[in-house]
Regions:
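OB-fold (S1/OB) nucleic-acid-binding surfaces
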Residues: 101-107, 165-172
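Helical segment within the ABC ATPase nucleotide-binding domain
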Residues: 15-28
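ABC-family nucleotide-binding domains
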Residues: 10
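Internal alpha/beta loop-helix hairpins
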Residues: 26, 36-106
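Short aromatic-glycine-enriched beta-strand elements
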Residues: 96-99, 159-164
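Glycine/charge-rich catalytic "coupling/switch" loops of P-loop NTPases
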Residues: 107-154, 171-175
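Catalytic Walker B motif of ABC-type/P-loop ATPase nucleotide-binding domains
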Residues: 1-4
């Protein structure tokens, strides 16, 4: 049982220690119950998660499934709602430190100079960082633009709505006003 084991560490040290915790589980097959409020830590090391809210289990299952459930979109907090997408590093541009991450709906380009081609990982795209357009944007500095189909719209709270967009079979959430 690891109950918030990295809570006292600064962000840089957390990212140094997390691979070692992940390696213990993978190399030795030792099950770890890892308690955390950090979505980033969970994405780095967990395969299965149990979401506890209000003193009870709200959801359990594979990390991607739990964190992509529409009814739990806000479980991470309003500013952290988003999509978890499994990707594979398929290209690296060392001159610029840009990695190409492929998924069912296309390719993300992100700054990630330490990735290795072939490496599989999960990324989280915050819903508040996803813009929607009726036409393909031009003359913008945005690296990641995808075509998709609006699959659903649901009320958030306040002036926002959550929009699910199907991008090649992958659901990506957007939170718009």
């Amino acid at each position: 049982l690891m109950d918030e084991p990295l809570a006292a560490l600064d962000a840089e040290r957390k990212w140094e220690v997390l691979p070692f915790i992940d390696r213990i589980q993978r190399d030795f097959g030792t099950p770890i119950v890892y308690v955390s409020h950090s979505i980033e830590e969970i994405l780095q090391i967990a395969d299965t998660m149990v979401l506890i809210a209000g003193g009870g289990v709200s959801a359990a299952g594979p990390v991607e499934e739990v964190l992509n459930r529409p009814d739990l979109l806000r479980a991470a907090g309003d500013g952290n709602a988003g999509s978890v997408i499994p990707v594979q590093a398929t290209g690296l541009d060392p001159a610029y430190g840009i990695a190409t991450l492929s998924f069912a709906g296309g390719e993300f380009r992100v700054t990630a100079p330490d990735l290795t081609v072939g490496e599989r990982l999960r990324i989280r795209v915050r819903a508040r960082d996803v813009s929607l357009a009726t036409e393909r944007p031009q003359h913008v500095s945005v690296l990641n633009v995808f075509e998709g189909t609006v699959a659903g719209v649901s009320s958030a709270h306040g002036p926002q709505v959550d929009v699910s967009v199907d991008v090649g079979g992958t659901m990506i959430w957007s939170q718009i006003t």
